[in-house]
Curated annotation (Swiss-Prot):
Entry GO MF terms: formyl-CoA transferase activity
Family matches, as Pfam families: CoA_transf_3
Role description: Involved in the catabolism of oxalate and in the adapatation to low pH via the induction of the oxalate-dependent acid tolerance response (ATR). Catalyzes the transfer of the CoA moiety from formyl-CoA to oxalate. It can also use succinate as an acceptor.
Top-level taxonomy: Bacteria, Pseudomonadati, Pseudomonadota, Gammaproteobacteria, Enterobacterales
Species annotation: Escherichia coli (strain K12)
The entry's keywords: Transferase
Name of the molecule in the record: Formyl-CoA:oxalate CoA-transferase
Keyword Nucleus: no
Induction: By the acid response regulator EvgA.
Family according to the record: Belongs to the CoA-transferase III family. Frc subfamily.
């Protein structure tokens, strides 16, 4: 089966989550991704949050499928020689080390261009070079705090909150992926590679663009009418936290369903659409609200929006969340059950679509991982298990022209 990135070779100098999520997607698209790891140690996530002693952790296996792994000590002369040969043959190099780490290995961007002017260099950092935080170590929640997500997440009477979704890590990897694919297309026109940099702060901010929109509206108006604080609360000079309110001008809220007292996920998310207000009133048994001036327009509803949600909840609390969604969908109401990770892991439709897949690694055995979220008509990514540490060292070195004796000598010299 032909794949989009067949024939593309990627050197993966990434660790933890932001970089590996990017290179994993490149591998799913058919690229030959060679993960370069420290001999005897490997990616730190191989050892983090283990559920089975002395076996690669799920943290690693779920971010590194379809890759090859080699152990390489780039501090040795032989290791540097191997690195240079790999760069000569590669199309893309991706790294997410702390600033300057690749340079200290002796492979500055200028030197890499001399070795292989067609190579595309992808780099993830916490902050842009011009940021006052450029030297701050950045992880998932650091990026959420600096990118605008934390200050706008949570309830108005509580502290900032970080999202459980990987807005700082995997989201940054997906942004870099887009940049690398664009650079590959650009290389077809120019014949040359380029450097593509992605800061975690920028990636989070890009997902918070509607909050930047709201900041400008707040600066001009002094209030934001779609937020729960309007019209009875007060607004400061920055976009506030709005709890579970909808952020697109269509009010929404989390509503209780049957069993909420004991099930922490017995809820649905319910959205009120202006154009669907009549159907909404019929669905909740309030047809008189259709023409009532106090309810008939979005502007009129906002002052008592929580009273409206409370009325709707009188119905949803009597039935199962799935029954509630099935009923409300008949009225074209945007809603969804709050699904737990347990429910998602067992969902047959997600298995059928390939969004959740089961793979097998020699030592770990079978485990679940996410599949490719994009669905293509011309090919289906074949999701494979993550590599064992150094599993492909000999094969990759042989492809570079090294003999078995030379490989044995490098191992003896701790270069691999």
């Amino acid at each position: 089966m032909s794949t989009p990135l067949q024939g593309i070779k990627v050197l993966d100098f990434t660790g933890v989550q932001s970089g590996p999520s990017c290179t994993q997607m490149l591998a799913w698209f058919g690229a030959d991704v060679i993960k370069i790891e420290r001999p005897g140690v490997g990616d730190v996530t191989r050892h983090q949050l283990r559920d089975i002693p002395d076996i690669d952790a799920l943290y690693f296996t779920m971010l590194n499928s379809n890759k090859r792994s080699i152990e390489l000590n780039t501090k040795t002369a032989e290791g540097k020689e191997v690195m240079e040969k790999l760069i000569r043959e590669a199309d893309i190099l991706v790294e997410n080390f702390h600033p300057g780490a690749i340079d200290h290995m002796g492979f500055t961007w200028e030197h890499i261009q001399e070795i292989n002017p067609r190579l595309i260099f992808g780099s993830i950092k916490g902050f842009d070079e011009c940021s006052p935080y450029v030297n701050v170590k950045a992880y998932e929640n650091v990026a959420q705090a600096a990118g605008g997500a934390a200050s706008t997440t949570g309830f108005w009477d509580g502290p900032p909150l970080v999202s459980a979704a990987a807005l700082g890590d995997s989201n940054t990897g997906m942004h870099l992926l887009i940049g690398l694919l664009a650079a590959l297309l650009h290389r077809e026109k120019t014949g040359r590679g380029q450097r593509v940099t992605m800061s975690m702060q920028d990636a989070v901010l890009n997902l918070c663009r509607v909050k930047l929109r709201d900041q400008q509206r707040l600066d001009k108006l002094g209030y934001l009418e779609e937020y729960p604080q309007y019209p009875n609360g007060t607004f400061g000079d920055a976009v506030p936290r709005g709890g579970n309110a909808g952020g697109g001008g269509q009010p929404g809220w989390i509503l209780k369903c049957k069993g909420w007292e004991t099930d922490p996920n017995a809820y649905i998310y319910f959205t009120i659409q202006e154009q669907n207000w009549e159907n909404t009133c019929k669905a909740i048994g309030k047809p008189e609200w259709i023409t009532d001036p106090a309810y008939s327009t979005a502007h009129a509803r906002q002052p008592h929006i929580f009273d409206i949600f409370a009325e709707i909840e009188k119905y949803t609390v009597t039935i199962d969340k799935h029954e509630a969604v099935a009923y409300l969908t008949q009225f074209d109401i945007p809603c969804a059950p709050v699904l737990s990770m347990k429910e998602i892991s067992l969902d047959p439709s997600l298995r059928q679509s390939g969004s959740v897949v089961e793979v097998e690694q020699p030592l770990r055995g079978k485990y679940l991982t996410v599949g490719c979220p994009m669905k293509f008509s011309a090919f289906t990514p074949d999701i494979k298990a993550a590599p064992l540490l150094g599993e492909h060292t000999a094969a990759v070195l042989q492809e570079l022209g090294y003999s078995d004796d030379e490989i044995a000598a490098m191992k003896q010299n701790h270069a691999i």
